Amino acid sequence: MTVHRKRESMRENVVKNLQNNLALDNCVLHWDGKIMPDNEEPGNVDRLAIVITASGQETFLEAPKISSGTGENQASVIVSKMRDWSVTDKVKALCFDTTATNTGVHNGSCVLIEQALKRELIYLPCRHHILELVLRSVFESYWPTSSGPNVPIFTRFKDKWSEIDQQKYVAGISDQGVFGVIGDTKEQILILLTNYSQISQPRGDYRELLELAFIFLGAIPPNGVMFKRPGAVHHARWMAKAIYNLKIFLFRNQFKLTNSEMKGVRQVCVFIIKFYVKIWFSATSAITAPNNDLKLMQELLSYNKINPLVSKNASEKMAKHLWYLSEELAALSLFDMNVSLEIKKNSYSSKIE
């Protein structure tokens, strides 16, 4: 037996053991399509990552190839894999990106999965996807989509990086315009950052965002001050753009910016520190989502007194994605420790009347 075939045999045995030993009562099904290099032929291929979560545990099922990312193709593959893993009766909810491919009322993946299972499921839209749309609306307040996915300022900064003295960064909070907006809440934000930094993050860019937020506020991250070389800026990764904005502002004394660019970078950074970090790192909790989304909407509307443009664009975008304030999902707040008992009682009473 060749090494390749032996590896394949071992992988098949591992999968079978996982399938046989998977002990779940109720779970949430997650999926996300990705374009990846094909490991068999030259070029790229569409793959659909399928995961189930239950009781704080995550199980990766498979990432099969799909011919195209249509709702019908996705649903067909997902249902097939659910049956392979014997979890069709255990899946109670779906977590997905809020694209038409998934949410379409006739041919969306969600409704087609329900039809295949012959029962309704709870919809738990991916809040990270929703929040990236909100960040995009803020970013495009200063850099319209006509600038393209690779905004010239990021390309310039990336090319300039080798000339920048990383020891001579300037904290964002030292800027008068920044301090005037977030100076009063600096300590509260740092407490949140400290709490989030103690939690294992699934991606390197999540950790980098946390570290840059510490530095922006004039503090030292738990692992010290370090800066990573600016990477690729893909139009679909708004996290990368957030990281670029923070770095540019930290090195604003070494990187030449026009007045318009300085204003845009400053305002995007303020939004990231004041709003985005908190909502991003709490996004995975469905129980706290209703209360968090309600507070976010209230804060975005109140922000009109400080920045009417950002307030308008961000609140309008968020208003289109208030899934967790629906009657069905708002009930999750009954389990939220941050919601007062009085509010829970009133909410419960209104539902049974």
Map each language-model feature to its residues.
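Alpha-helical structural modules in large enzymes and assemblies
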Residues: 1-353
